[in-house]
């Protein structure tokens, strides 16, 4: 499986990427929303893992633009935002899953 991780926090990105690669996944990492959108629109992925708070283009807008372009890659939001409203917004914008970070 090929995954896209869009995460600006380098420590979180390294932790997630290392774990996924050890599990046998191929992972591409984008450090901001614009780079993530470019990759999502030009490369095939089995899953996109997207943070909400990103530089250049926020995660919700990225997801909206991906869906507007008829890209059906499943999207998992991985975010420090934990409120019910944040989760509902994410699902309404086109994400398939929402995982709140703790720590």
PLM regions and their residue ranges:
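N-terminal/domain-start alpha-helical segments
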Residues: 1-103
């Amino acid at each position: 499986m090929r995954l896209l991780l869009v995460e600006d926090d380098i420590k979180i990105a390294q932790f997630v990427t290392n774990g996924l690669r050890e599990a046998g996944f191929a992972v591409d990492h984008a450090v901001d929303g614009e780079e993530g959108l470019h990759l999502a629109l030009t490369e095939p992925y089995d899953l996109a893992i997207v943070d909400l708070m990103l530089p250049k283009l926020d995660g919700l807008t990225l997801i909206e633009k991906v869906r507007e372009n008829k890209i059906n890659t499943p999207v998992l939001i991985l975010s420090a935002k934990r409120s019910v409203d944040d989760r509902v917004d994410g699902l309404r914008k086109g994400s398939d899953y929402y995982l709140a970070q703790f720590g």
